[in-house]
């Protein structure tokens, strides 16, 4: 609806603009009143007036024409509304108020009229006849420019029907106004014959212009030549324009008369020549004058005896011409206004058609909307009725549910009271039972504490018994170790006693054999000394010498036996101490193992695996350490064996002594051990210088040959290690006596000699290994 109001307001505005351009003052006032009323009525509603209101205010004849005509859209003239309104106001102020049936001038006429009055008020203008016809004064330059623009303007051509209607209505008053129309040449041919009105002019006949001065009308001379009958062509399209009409109609009569008289007096008094052809071709206003003007001109040239008669005739002609011109202009204005009204009516019809179509579309849309609203209202009513029924059912259900709930709550309250009484009785009974159970639990806790104390006492007694058992086991192991030691010592003692007995037997046999050999040697010496009588004192000397040597050797043997017993005692003590230390270490390790096993946690797969790894690592380390110890022992024993082998190679060369008397109380094993020990000690101790040549001599002598008795060194007595005895001679004497070569003394065979040497070497190695272990 807003768009319809806007469009109606736009249509009214266009109508007012067109009426201001082309209509009369009455219709303009009517449309302005309609617009003002629409503006006052639409100020509250926010829009312009409706087309119905504007149509009601129009005149009745306008409404009839509005219903029959069609609308024509304006051709780009909407922007001239303000200018046309201003021109209309100016025209209303300048022109007198016309009557009811009088036509008002158009916008272009009012504009030209206002320009004319502005020029009159600006200052005195030069007379039109005072200037040259060919000149171009500056006073009429604005009118010339307006005419120049009119040449390029649009020419309004009317339809034949409208022209015939206007001619039928106004044909009696203006029969000669269409004489020279270019649009309707048949009218011009029919109206060329009427005679001029008015009395025939008296006086001399006026002459026309000379042939060398053609009637050429320029554009700037149009304003002065408009009222001249020679230059008027009413059918020309240029004279049909509004500005030309305003110049023809609105010039004051006094000014026109003065101008016409001045022009007429200045014309030459000659007969008019036929019009030059150039007159028709120069300028838009160059056309033939009408016959009613040409007639008086011919009469003026023929008969004008005096100037006054001529002037009177001219005045009558001018008045008639002005009257005809006014009638023609009025008819033209009526024709133009009717054409403009027809165009406006067409535009109004088109706009009304468009408004009616919009109204019909709006009505259809509103009918559709109303139908849709009706259907939606019906749907909503049905939905509301359905919801009301549903709400009623729900309310009934709610009431029934509330009633049932109230009855149930009452029943539940009664049942709950009974249940509460029962629960109270049950809770009292349960409290009594709970008190009984608590007393029983207190008794059981006391019994459990007694049981726990008893268990602790039993565990303590068990731990004490286990400790006593462990200590008893340890003591038992120690006693068993002592028993084993005693048994081993007894076995060793028995073995030593057996060895001593065997050694004593061997020594007895050797002693007896040596005594026998000694006796044999003495007998040989006697037999050898008898032949030589001269040397009677030599046997005595040899006997004394031998007795001294024997005594020295016995002393040496005694000293060696003492040393041997001392070292044997030390060896036994050291061996016993070593055995005791080994047993103590074994018992400590066993006890440690038992404590570890006892205090170890319960075995688990992971802990057993870790313990297996740890025990394996410990065993591996123990084996490595044991291997290292054994390797060191082997190296030491190898070194001792090498030393003993060297000494054994040296010992046989020193066994060059006579018969020895071994001690009966010294076992043979101890002798061998003492000999080995003495030989081993002799490596570290410093030997006497006197023993060096004897040892070197024995080293050079071969083992197979019998060695003769070496000369005895000087007696250099020195104390032994323990200081018990004093011996003369080197300490190697015992080993030499124990390691005597059987071939040199007893004459044994080679096999017996090697067997005895092997047994002596084996005993030495065994004893030395034991001594090295003890010392380590």
Swiss-Prot record:
Task: Tell me the segments the record calls region Required for interaction with CDH5.
Answer: 101-307
Key words, A-Z: Cell junction, Cell projection, Coiled coil, Cytoplasm, Endosome, Isopeptide bond, Phosphoprotein, Ubl conjugation, Wnt signaling pathway
Site (Required for interaction with MAGI1 and ACTB) at 107
Site positions per UniProt: Required for interaction with YAP1 and ubiquitination at K-347 and K-408: 213
One Gene Ontology cellular component annotation? plasma membrane
Which InterPro entries does the UniProt record give?
Angiomotin (IPR009114), Angiomotin-like (IPR051747), Angiomotin_C (IPR024646)
One Gene Ontology term from the biological process aspect of the record: negative regulation of transcription by RNA polymerase II
Assembly state and interactors?
A: Part of a complex composed of AMOTL2, MAGI1 and CDH5, within the complex AMOTL2 acts as a scaffold protein for the interaction of MAGI1 with CDH5. The complex is required for coupling actin fibers to cell junctions in endothelial cells. Within the complex AMOTL2 (via its N-terminus) interacts with CDH5. Interacts (via N-terminus) with MAGI1. Interacts (via N-terminus) with ACTB; the interaction facilitates binding of cell junction complexes to actin fibers in endothelial cells. Interacts with CDH1; the interaction may facilitate binding of radial actin fibers to cell junction complexes.
Name of the molecule in the record? Angiomotin-like protein 2
The scientific name of the source species is Canis lupus familiaris (Dog)
Q: What is the lineage of its organism?
A: Eukaryota, Metazoa, Chordata, Craniata, Vertebrata
Gene from which this protein is expressed: AMOTL2
């Amino acid at each position: 609806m807003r768009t319809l109001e806007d469009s109606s307001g736009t249509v009214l505005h266009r109508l007012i603009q067109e009426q201001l351009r082309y209509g009369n003052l009455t219709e303009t006032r009517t449309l302005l009143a309609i617009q003002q009323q629409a503006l006052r009525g639409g100020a509250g509603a926010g829009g312009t007036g409706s087309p119905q209101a504007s149509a009601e205010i129009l005149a009745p004849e306008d409404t009839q024409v509005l219903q029959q005509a069609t609308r024509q859209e304006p051709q780009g003239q909407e922007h001239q509304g303000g200018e046309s309104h201003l021109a209309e106001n100016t025209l209303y102020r300048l022109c007198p108020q016309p009557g009811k049936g009088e036509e008002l001038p158009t916008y272009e006429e009012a504009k030209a009229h206002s320009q004319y009055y502005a020029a009159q008020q600006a200052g005195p203008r030069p007379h039109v006849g005072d200037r040259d016809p060919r000149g171009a004064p500056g006073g009429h330059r604005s009118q010339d420019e307006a005419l120049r623009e009119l040449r390029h303007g649009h020419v309004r051509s009317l339809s034949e029907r409208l022209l015939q209607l206007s001619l039928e209505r106004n044909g009696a008053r203006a029969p000669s106004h269409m004489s020279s129309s270019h649009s309707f040449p048949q009218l011009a041919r029919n109206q060329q014959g009427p005679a001029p009105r008015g009395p025939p002019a008296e006086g001399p006949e006026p002459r026309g212009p000379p042939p060398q001065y053609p009637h050429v009308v320029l554009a700037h001379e149009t304003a002065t030549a408009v009222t001249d009958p020679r230059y008027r062509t009413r059918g020309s399209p240029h004279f049909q324009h509004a500005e030309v009409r305003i110049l023809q109609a609105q010039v004051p009569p006094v000014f026109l008369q003065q101008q016409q008289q001045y022009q007429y007096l200045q014309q030459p008094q000659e007969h008019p020549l036929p019009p030059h052809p150039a007159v028709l071709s120069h300028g838009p206003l160059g056309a033939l004058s009408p016959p009613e003007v040409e007639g008086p001109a011919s009469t003026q040239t023929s008969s004008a005896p005096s100037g006054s008669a001529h002037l009177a005739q001219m005045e009558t002609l001018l008045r008639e011409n002005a009257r005809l011109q006014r009638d023609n202009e009025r008819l033209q204005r009526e024709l133009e206004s009717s054409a403009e009204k027809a165009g406006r009516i067409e535009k109004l019809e088109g706009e009304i058609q468009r408004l009616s179509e919009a109204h019909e579309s709006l009505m259809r849309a509103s009918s559709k909307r109303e139908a849709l609203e009706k259907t939606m209202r019906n749907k909503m009513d049905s939905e509301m009725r359905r919801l009301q029924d549903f709400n009623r059912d729900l309310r009934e259900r709610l009431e029934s549910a509330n009633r049932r709930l109230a009855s149930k709550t009452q029943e539940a309250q009664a049942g709950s009271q009974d249940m509460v009484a029962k629960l109270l009785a049950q809770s009292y009974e349960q409290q009594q039972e709970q008190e009984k159970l608590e007393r029983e639990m207190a008794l059981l806790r006391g019994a459990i504490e007694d049981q726990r104390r008893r268990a602790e006492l039993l565990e303590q007694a068990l731990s004490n018994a286990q400790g006593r058992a462990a200590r008893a086991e340890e003591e038992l192991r120690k006693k068993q170790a002592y028993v084993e030691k005693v048994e081993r010592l007894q076995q060793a003692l028995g073995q030593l006693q057996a060895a001593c007995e065997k050694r004593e037997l061997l020594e007895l046999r050797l002693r007896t054999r040596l005594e026998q050999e000694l006796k044999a040697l003495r007998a040989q010496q006697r037999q050898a000394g008898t032949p030589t009588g001269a040397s009677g004192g030599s046997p005595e000397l040899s006997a004394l010498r031998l007795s001294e040597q024997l005594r020295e050797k016995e002393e040496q043997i005694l000293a060696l036996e003492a040393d041997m017993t001392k070292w044997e005692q030390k060896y036994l003590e050291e061996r016993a101490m070593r055995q005791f230390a080994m047993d103590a270490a074994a018992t400590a390790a066993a006890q440690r193992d038992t404590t570890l096993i006892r205090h170890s946690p319960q075995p688990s797969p992971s802990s057993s695996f870790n313990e297996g790894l740890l025990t394996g690592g410990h065993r591996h380390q123990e084996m490595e350490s044991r291997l290292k110890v054994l390797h060191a022992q082997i190296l030491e024993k190898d070194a001792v064996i090498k030393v003993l082998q060297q000494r054994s190679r040296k010992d046989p060369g020193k066994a060059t002594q006579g018969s020895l008397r071994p001690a009966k109380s010294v076992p043979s094993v101890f002798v061998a051990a003492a000999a080995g020990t003495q030989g081993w000690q002799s490596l570290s101790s410093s030997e006497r210088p006197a023993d060096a040549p004897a040892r070197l001599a024995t080293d050079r002598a071969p083992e197979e040959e019998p060695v003769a008795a070496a000369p005895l060194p000087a007696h250099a007595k020195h104390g032994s290690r323990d200081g018990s005895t004093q011996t003369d001679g080197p300490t190697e004497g015992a080993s030499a006596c124990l390691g005597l070569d059987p071939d040199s003394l007893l004459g044994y065979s080679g096999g017996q000699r090697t067997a005895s040497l092997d047994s002596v070497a084996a005993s030495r190695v065994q004893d030395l290994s034991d001594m090295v272990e003890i010392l380590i």
